[in-house]
Amino acid sequence: MELVNPGYGSGFTFKLTKWKNIKRGYTHFADGDIAFAKITPCFQNRKSVIFKNLPSGIGAGTTELKVLRPYYRQMSHEYILAFLQSPYFIDEATFKGTANQQRIVSGYVENKLFPLPPIEEQQRITKRLEEISKMI
């Protein structure tokens, strides 16, 4: 989880390793996938990412990542990421588990209402969010 940057944005770093070492016991993802932390406090710290430019096009990470793979072409990856980092998504989550190992409840993402405007509006929103974040 330490390789995914907290806060708004989509920064991450990676380590190269042999696939046989990470084939099992890890969450797998590919270029274009969007992932977010499902464990506290990383979830509240908005640890989320759009995976881009992975050396082999695929990767593996902690099992504490929830990976989303948008198939619908009319969905902006940046818009989805902004939604995942929004107070609406973060603040309304409920958790389950022990005090030190709480995770978002199963089905939270699948049952969350997702506002989906036309692609042009998604792009306008994410462009404006980028402009505002540069001012902060």
State the predicted function of each range.
Residues N53-L54, R69-Y71:
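A structural micro-motif recognizing beta-strand termini
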Residues M1-I22:
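DNA target-recognition patches
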Residues I58-K66, T98-P117:
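A short glycine-rich beta-alpha junction/loop motif
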Residues S76-F83, E121, R128:
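Short amphipathic alpha-helical coupling segments at ligand-binding clamshell hinges
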Residues D91, N111-I136:
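Amphipathic alpha-helical coiled-coil/heptad-repeat segments
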Residues R46, P70, Q74, F83, ...:
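Catalytic cores of nucleotide-enabled group-transfer and carboxylate-activating enzymes in metabolic
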Residues L3-G9, Y26-S48, A60-L65, Y72, ...:
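Short Ser/Thr-interspersed hydrophobic loop/turn segments at strand-loop and sheet-helix junctions
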